[in-house]
């Protein structure tokens, strides 16, 4: 069974006894986008059919936005694209994007995963969260730290939803964020990067 076989959150809840709740755990300070990201997104939206496929959304929207914030944390963290992970026969697969602790051995070594980003296939957020929560459970078990917050994001490029798993409790942030409010979206990402880098010893 792979992460993508989980189509709904309740399937992961049933298999792993995960409690579900909603609250606003993100503390947002608006982030001033760089001229580079503004120009890149404007160019892409003007010249490319950015919503024509999953690959188009990932390459022209999702990755540039992640990179915009990630570059400020590159000394401590590593950004992975389509990096396969496996905890056991049921919890395995390939997250779209993953942030981990940066290994002292270099960028080719995967250290503790810190958060996961899932592209919502066919704009299906319900399935996206089923897959994302399965990935969060795998990461929590791989890390062996029940009390550590593991963050997840599900996005179709336009809409960004956030969640976190702590021990057996999954919290979905009540507020979501949209591409057209870029500074708030980047602020939400910055909050998560700030939180996960606190976990790095």
Which residue stretches match the model-derived regions?
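A short beta-strand->alpha-helix segment at the C-terminal rim
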Residues: 151-154
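A generic "binding-loop/recognition-motif" signal
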Residues: 158
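A short, conserved, highly charged catalytic patch centered on acidic carboxylates
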Residues: 2-3, 16-21, 26-149, 161-201
């Amino acid at each position: 069974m792979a992460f993508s076989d989980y189509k709904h959150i309740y399937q992961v809840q049933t298999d792993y006894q995960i409690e579900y709740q909603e609250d606003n755990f993100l503390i947002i300070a608006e982030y001033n986008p760089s001229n580079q990201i503004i120009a890149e997104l404007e160019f892409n939206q003007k010249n490319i059919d950015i919503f024509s496929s999953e690959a188009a959304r990932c390459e022209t929207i999702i990755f540039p936005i992640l990179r915009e914030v990630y570059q400020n944390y590159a000394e401590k963290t590593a950004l992975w694209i389509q990096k396969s992970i496996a905890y056991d026969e049921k919890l395995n697969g390939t997250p779209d994007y993953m942030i981990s602790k940066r290994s002292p051995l270099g960028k080719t070594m995967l250290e503790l995963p810190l958060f996961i980003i899932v592209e919502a296939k066919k704009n299906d957020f319900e399935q996206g969260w089923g897959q994302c929560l399965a990935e969060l459970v795998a990461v929590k078990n791989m890390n062996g730290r029940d009390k550590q917050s593991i963050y997840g994001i599900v996005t179709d490029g336009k809409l960004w939803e956030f969640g976190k798993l702590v021990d057996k409790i999954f919290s979905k942030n009540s507020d979501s964020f949209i591409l057209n409010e870029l500074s708030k979206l980047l602020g939400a990402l910055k909050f998560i990067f700030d939180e996960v880098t606190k976990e790095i010893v």
